[in-house]
């Protein structure tokens, strides 16, 4: 079993325990989705950054909760560090540019992509749907993983199917791994980043 999971917290508005988020994501990948091979990046961003991504890549105004970039069938070439430093201004061959140098490969293997999440939107949506922002954040990770698995939410029937699967996985996750501790404060130095390589 091998996989690479990188998590970057580029926002400070909401304190997120990135170690717990890593654990939750690994439970989803390995135990609930039975993924043995994966290269996944999760990037937590603030609303202004998510708004720019949403407008640039989806053509929608304002922020959104989660955007998924699937690198599995694109065959991107390795990008240099200059592209990583460029952030949102990076060449569009790798859409978000957050972790492009780490994740882009000539020969994609297994589940391969990047999930960008706006934590402030999780807080806002949690209030609207009367749930915790931690559960909403876990739902966004699940949503992104399902997109990487091939689920589509553009049409009504497909959207309902995806929502059902999100709910099922969220319930199963809650039984296996506590979600609420995502709110716990953890010491951070500079840009919080946790990488995991399992084999």
Positions of PLM-derived features:
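An acidic/histidine-cluster motif and surrounding catalytic segment
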Residues: 1-138, 146-199
């Amino acid at each position: 079993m091998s996989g690479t999971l990188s998590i970057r917290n580029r926002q400070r508005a909401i304190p997120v325990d990135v170690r717990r988020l890593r654990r939750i994501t690994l439970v989803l990948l390995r135990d609930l989705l039975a993924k043995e091979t994966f290269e996944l990046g999760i990037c937590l961003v603030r609303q202004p950054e998510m708004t720019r991504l949403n407008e640039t890549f989806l053509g929608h105004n304002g922020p959104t909760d989660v955007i998924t970039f699937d690198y599995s069938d694109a065959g991107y070439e390795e990008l240099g560090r200059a592209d990583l430093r460029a952030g949102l201004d990076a060449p569009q061959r790798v859409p978000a540019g957050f972790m492009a140098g780490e994740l882009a490969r000539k020969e994609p293997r297994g589940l391969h992509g990047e999930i960008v999440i706006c934590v402030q939107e999780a807080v806002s949506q949690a209030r609207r749907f009367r749930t915790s922002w931690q559960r909403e954040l876990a739902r966004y990770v699940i949503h992104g993983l399902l997109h990487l698995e091939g689920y589509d939410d553009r049409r009504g029937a497909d959207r309902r199917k995806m929502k059902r699967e999100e709910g099922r996985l969220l319930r199963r996750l809650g039984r296996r791994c506590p979600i609420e501790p995502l709110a716990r404060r953890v010491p951070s130095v500079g840009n919080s980043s946790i990488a995991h390589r399992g084999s």
